[in-house]
Amino acid sequence: MRKKLLVVVCLLILILMLPGCGKTAGPLDDYQGIDVVSPDWVGKLDAAGDAKQMLIVAAFSADATDAWISLHEKQSDGSWHMVMTSPGFIGKNGLGKTREGDAKTPVGIFHFNRAFGIADDPGCAIPYVKVDQDTYWSGDPRDGYRYNELVNLKDLPGLDLESGDSEHIIDYPYHYQYCLNISYNEEGTPGLGSAIFLHCLAPAKPFTGGCVSIPEDHMRFVMQKVDGSTAVVIDTYEALSGGTDWPDSTWPQER
């Protein structure tokens, strides 16, 4: 079953990488989600005890760049249901982020603390910032320059733009239509790493610089569903599931 899952994911990812598949040219179709019982291991995760909602990023191995991303919600009876599932990408060098520029996705339990994007607010529970020409994500390690935060150049006119460490959000029209910041290095320790987002899939690259990417229609759905209390759980599929297979009953079924 795991081999079958990997083959299907690889095929879906190849399709999504085709020009025009990551972002639609016309009006974006609404992804309506799914509603199926989550695999048993989801409810056994450490984050499941306190969380009412979990976004799970399950990489196929520690050095893989592809992953299966799913959103789960706790029901009134304590059971978990999966409401979104999608193939996606993680860092070019897999999992295990420890420093700026290592092109790895962090492992652990996080939350979303910022919502922003080039597009209009899709209806976020987290306060949303529509970016403009002056919006950057700061990678400037100097004191007072708000490393690992969304900033406006009008407020920080001295931000270092020459090094390329700070991301100019509108320069990434595919990736950053919609973005949620994952709370890695929330304290903003310079050099530990910055700009770890859940964002839209872009064509051509089967990896990210450390972020997590999913198709734009799925991303918009996620932004409409999650809030600041949503647990973001990232690890290998084997570590998360204990090596169990992903049941056939949880394959995507459109509502």
Region locations from a protein language model:
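Hydrophobic helical h-region of N-terminal Sec-dependent signal peptides
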Residues: 9-15
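Cell wall/extracellular polymer interaction/catalysis modules
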Residues: 26-208, 218-255
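Signal peptide processing junction and immediate N-terminal pro/mature segment
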Residues: 22-24
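A conserved hydrophobic position in a structured secondary element of the catalytic/binding core
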Residues: 214
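Short cysteine clusters
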Residues: 211
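Positively charged n-region of N-terminal signal peptides that target proteins for export
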Residues: 1-4
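C-terminal motif of bacterial Sec signal peptides marking the signal peptidase cleavage site
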Residues: 17-20
